[in-house]
């Protein structure tokens, strides 16, 4: 269930990034926030440590996993149920390409 208005447009997109420590992903979060502001996309974007966070009750429209936690994708998908879970590509992660990851989120959510 996405955060969608009656007119069918997104009110605010909630994007969660999960990685091993949360440190490197926090830089990607900042770049994604800047890209969202530049594109006038209302988005709540945050990062958590996938191994130390209970994702059972997370409220997100989409979840992206850093390359270092790809092994946990199936387990995380099972935990979060209907929330779509995607991998951040190695190139986008390595280059901290927030604009590209944001574009992927919008594409996956049909925005």
Where are each of the predicted segments found?
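Short glycine-rich or small-residue beta-strand-to-loop segments that form or flank ligand, phosphate
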Residues: 14-20, 61-64, 86-89
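Short, surface-exposed acidic/glycine-rich loop or hinge patches that mediate macromolecular interfaces
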Residues: 22-23, 67-70, 91-92
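Short, Lys/Arg-enriched N-terminal segments with co-localized hydrophobic residues
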Residues: 1-11
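Conserved active-site segments centered on acidic
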Residues: 13-52
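Cofactor-cradling patches in redox/metallo enzymes
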Residues: 43-52, 58-59, 65-85, 96-97, ...
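Short, well-ordered alpha-helices that flank and scaffold nucleotide-derived cofactor binding pockets
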Residues: 30, 34, 78, 103, ...
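Ser/Thr/Gly-rich flexible loops in soluble cytosolic domains mediating phosphotransfer, phosphorylation
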Residues: 14, 84-111
